[in-house]
């Protein structure tokens, strides 16, 4: 079995191979472009993955008709058309609608933030690339193929949470410093323009 080289103190169990479909339910969004509204339920597609924010909305009626399953807090959205394999964890309790260019993962037996980070790791990305239709333009992965991607995980939920929390804090720290960097970069450019 697999075992990471670096571990948090107190965790010694082997990691095991699992397929994504064994630890999460996988769905895709609507296949037709909806009729947009000025307000309503936020509608996400591949270009919104970084922020999970959009200026596109659909009506409550369209949402009720088209979405039996929709993203909820703790779920993961993954790009599957064009940019394949970028993920983000849903952190809002508001209703969200999404396009077919995104896959919705509802973690069942795994911590969301742990899974989000595992999905960005080389092993998962390699498995994703092997199942991506590279000849398609734009490239894409079929929804059914996503669940077949193998990766290594700890089955210890406490270890998953500890790893997930650690990477979540690290992501927030990186974002904080990126904002500071951009602020100083903007300040520098203003000084140069004088």
Describe each model-derived feature in a short phrase:
Residues 1-13, 179-194:
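Short amphipathic coiled-coil heptad-repeat segments
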Residues 8, 15-17, 149-153, 167-173, ...:
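Long, compositionally biased tandem-repeat segments
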Residues 31, 95-102, 134-159:
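A short glycine-rich beta-alpha junction/loop motif
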Residues 32-50:
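Short beta-strand/loop turn elements enriched in aromatics
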Residues 7-30:
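Non-catalytic DNA-recognition/assembly elements of restriction-modification systems
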Residues 45-47, 56, 61-125, 137:
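A short beta-sheet element
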Residues 4, 161-173, 177-178:
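Extracellular/lumenal glycan-associated surfaces
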């Amino acid at each position: 079995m697999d075992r990471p080289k670096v571990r948090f103190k107190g965790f010694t169990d082997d990691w095991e191979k699992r397929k994504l479909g064994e630890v999460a339910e996988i769905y895709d969004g609507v296949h037709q472009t909806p009729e947009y509204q000025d307000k309503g339920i936020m509608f996400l597609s591949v270009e919104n993955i970084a922020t999970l924010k959009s200026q596109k909305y659909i009506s409550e009626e369209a949402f009720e008709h088209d979405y039996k399953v929709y993203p909820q807090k703790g779920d993961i959205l993954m790009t599957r058309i064009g940019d394949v394999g970028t993920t983000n964890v849903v952190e809002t309790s508001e209703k969200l609608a999404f396009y077919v260019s995104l896959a919705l993962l509802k973690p069942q037996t795994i911590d969301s933030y742990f899974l989000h980070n595992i999905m960005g790791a080389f092993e998962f990305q390699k498995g994703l690339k092997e199942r991506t239709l590279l000849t398609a333009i734009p490239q894409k992965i079929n929804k059914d193929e996503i669940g077949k991607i193998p990766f290594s995980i700890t089955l210890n939920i406490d270890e998953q949470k500890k790893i997930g929390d650690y990477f979540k804090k690290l992501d927030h720290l990186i974002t904080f410093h990126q904002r500071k960097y951009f602020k100083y970069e903007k300040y520098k450019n203003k000084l140069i323009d004088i």
